[in-house]
């Protein structure tokens, strides 16, 4: 039996701002969208041409406040062919929240 990773889900407060961020910061664009008939939720799958893996962004009508992730620690890792260029972009965007230069990683 083989399992294949398909997507990771994040709930978002502002779907449009999230879509803009993931496209600008990581080059992820909308692949498909599901809208509930009653308008209570919207799910957008974003990705790029380097992998079939997708990020699922879920907006919930009844959750207008920011999400509190508490002490839960999670991350979605990316490899990039131009580390310095990516770092410069994310630095310009002001979205780097932690760096570990000795490991060659940073978090946005």
Language-model features, listed with the residues they occupy:
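Vicinal oxygen chelate
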Residues: 1-3, 33-34, 45, 84-108
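Core segments of cupin and vicinal oxygen chelate
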Residues: 2, 9-52
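Eukaryotic phosphotyrosine signaling hubs
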Residues: 5-7, 71-76
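Helix N-cap motif at beta-to-alpha junctions
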Residues: 14-15, 80-84
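Exposed loop/turn and edge beta-strand positions of beta-sandwich/beta-sheet ligand-binding modules
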Residues: 40, 72, 103
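Short, charged/polar surface micro-motifs in flexible loops or helix N-caps
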Residues: 49-53, 62-64, 83-84
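Unchanged
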Residues: 64-70
């Amino acid at each position: 039996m083989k399992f294949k990773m398909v997507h990771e889900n994040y709930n978002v407060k502002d779907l449009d701002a999230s879509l803009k961020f993931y496209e600008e910061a990581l080059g992820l664009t909308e692949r498909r969208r599901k809208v509930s008939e009653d308008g209570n939720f919207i799910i957008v799958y974003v990705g790029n041409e380097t992998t079939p893996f997708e990020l699922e962004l879920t907006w919930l009508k009844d959750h207008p406040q920011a999400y509190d992730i508490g002490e839960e620690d999670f991350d979605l890792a990316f490899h990039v062919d131009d580390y310095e260029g990516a770092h410069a972009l994310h630095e310009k965007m002001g979205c780097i929240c932690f760096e570990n230069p000795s490991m060659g990683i940073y978090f946005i």
